Amino acid sequence: MKPLVTLFLAVVLTMPLMAQHEEDFAAHFVELNGSEADLECTTVSPRMMERILMLPNDTTESDTLRPLLEQVKSVRIVNCTTTPEAAVLLYEKAEVLAQYHPLGYQRYAHDADCTIYTRRRGEFIVELVLIMQTEGTFCLVDLTGNMTGEILRIGVVKGER
């Protein structure tokens, strides 16, 4: 019995460490498709997010946005300017990856050229992925953190997708 308890404790104690090393959607997408397409990936790290939050509030809109930004740990933006056909292909590859990814992304919203996926852990959204394509441009925005559903609602109120 003692070895089982020890094994259980070892597994439970290492789970947070494994969760910290999960690869986010954008990094996984670039790893799979970066050699085929000229993908440009920009990352806003947790440290940079902290610095952004230290900036003074100078607009009333920041009163609404600041609590949402506090929930975001990092941001990755993947861009590719290419032919319209290649942009559609990248969009379709991102859709397939999200639908069949083992971490379990759920589609939140979708239209012809834009889809939003979320990944939850408990009551929090730990990852929000926006996939878009327009004539010759593919864009993927990946937010990670411990976000509430308010981050999705604010986009709807502001008239965004």
Features from the language model and the residues they span:
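Bacterial Sec-dependent N-terminal signal peptides
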Residues: 1-25
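Early exported N-terminus immediately downstream of N-terminal targeting peptides
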Residues: 21-83
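Short, solvent-exposed secondary-structure boundary motifs
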Residues: 57-58, 105-110, 120
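Mid-length scaffold segments of soluble, non-membrane domains
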Residues: 68-112
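A short, solvent-exposed beta-edge/loop patch
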Residues: 117-148
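A recognition module on extended beta-rich or small alphabeta surfaces enriched in W/G with H and D/E
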Residues: 149, 153-161
